[in-house]
Amino acid sequence: IGAGPGGIFSAFELMKKSPETRVAVFEEGNTLEKRKCPIDGKKVKSCIKCPTCAIMNGFGGAGAFSDGKYNITNDFGGTLYEYIGRDQAINLMKYVDTINTSHGGEETHMYSTAGTKFKTLCMQNKLKLLDASVRHLGTDINYVVLENMYNEMKDHIDFYFNTPVSNIEVIDGGYRVFYKDEYMDCDKCIVSVGRSGSKWIENVCQKLEIPTKSNRVDIGVRVELPAVIFSHLTDELYESKIVYRTEKFEDLVRTFCMNPNGIVVNENTNGIVTVNGHSYEGAEKQTENTNFALLVAKHFSEPFKDSNGYGESIARLSNMLGGGVIVQRFGDLMRGRRSTEKRIEEGLVKPTLAATPGDLSLVLPKRILDGIIEMIYALDKIAPGTANDDTLLYGVEVKFYNMEVEIDNNLETRYKGLYIIGDGSGVTHSLSHASASGVYVARKIIEEM
């Protein structure tokens, strides 16, 4: 259930290693070529909240139109290694990389933090650079890879597009999957519904009495600035995952999803418009700006457990004030005033997303905003110009994490043959980890045949 990275790679592995196995994939969204967001920058300038978001749903999942970064590391992107072991997790991510590079990504570059001088530079300025090897496909090549994989799979696997699954029931010898006014029985069921399926998976777990526990939510902004400011980092590392501990509250703030010469985009999750970023491998689609997120993770304990609800309420406030995403100059934020169209037009950084000028201090909680401001000044020490007045901040960016589902080392629930994988499990938070979890479960199923 779900044709995102986890679902695709589990189905692909079953097709390759066990071709006699009948596999059906149910996907709420459309085929890859029919996934079209109506925003064109002309007639439709902002999100119109389609019932099924073409950016978030469909073949390829939310990652289909991402910048296609596959981080091969256990340091971030999920806790898959806690279930299957560090070595196996890395080996599976490397295997996923071979699939991507053999389906259109062979000319793309692998970046690495190994031996970089920037680790020392970060440490000298109270920052930490996390270790990773990064395969950057780019939004354009990522699409090609998915297209090639689908073309290889479509004649061997039964795909049901525009077909949301309403319920799963346990029956003798397997599971009954309900969709529209029909149902299908199966021996094994792999649930891979991603972050956009968070409410759905929560309901399924409640009905089947599968234990879950609260996860975190990441809240922050997307920063956009001239690409030359970060070029000394991005030319060598492409993406740098940098962590800072704030002096005021000792909260951790981190960079996320860095897009050199990229664009800022809207994202619709459960009817709420947030912000994200993309980048392209092809020079013809590149811009003069680089963007990245600055995020603060919030964990909650008793009595409050709804971390996603907390993030949604902040995003809704942004939508209420700005009709969608708000953009603000850093200089305006520090002067305690909202940005205006005139000041943004006069600025040195030309926005790549049509957003509403406003005041993010009316949206973000003070503790989170203080942490982001501290981080910007810390980054300014390793990338001078980050804290320039004309640096743009888009808000809000929220990364929702599913409730962490109770699964065993096979990624299997308390029900034999019912697996929950990818970001929908709350265990993975990245393309590489989600894809690796799909391969892992497919191999476990084949072992049991």
Tell where the protein language model's regions lie, with residue ranges.
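Residues forming the flavin
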Residues: I1-G77, Y111-T116, T120-M449
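Dinucleotide-binding Rossmann-like beta1-alpha1 core, especially the glycine-rich loop
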Residues: G58-T108
